[in-house]
């Protein structure tokens, strides 16, 4: 059986980003995990940046470093919890962290370093996140 293929149109991609930017009037964060869902991380970051997108979300530290390689001034949010040994790369590459449990907060405190963090709070979907009463 042949594989299916999707071809992305650069003009349409940028147009869609512009529509989203105009609807939200807020800074957008483009999720580019898993090689931009198979569409090519480098392609997605370059073209999104051409549209003014400066913030990208990834699933791994390696993906975050790839984004920084394509667009050094980008802001990168790591969606997954990294291992303690990855924290040095995170610090060196100025990657924001997602915090969704107390044990990871304790790990960050133990390092005595400063990190940009985003709290993921479980508001009822029961996927990931700290219960609101913890904060």
Where are these regions (language model features)?
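Active-site-proximal beta-alpha core segment in soluble small-molecule metabolic enzymes
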Residues: 4-7, 26-135
């Amino acid at each position: 059986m042949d594989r299916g293929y999707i071809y992305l149109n650069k003009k349409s991609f940028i147009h869609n980003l512009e529509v989203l930017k105009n609807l939200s009037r807020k800074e957008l964060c483009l999720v580019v995990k898993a090689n931009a869902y198979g569409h090519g991380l480098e392609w997605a970051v370059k073209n999104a940046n051409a549209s003014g997108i400066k913030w990208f979300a990834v699933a791994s530290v390696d993906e975050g470093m790839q984004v920084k390689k394509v667009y050094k001034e980008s802001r990168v949010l790591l969606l997954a919890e990294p291992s303690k040994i990855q924290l040095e790369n995170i610090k060196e590459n100025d990657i924001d962290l997602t915090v969704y449990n107390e044990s990871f907060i304790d790990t960050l405190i133990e390092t005595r370093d400063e990190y940009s963090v985003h709290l993921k709070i479980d508001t009822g979907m029961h996927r990931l996140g700290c219960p609101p009463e913890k904060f």
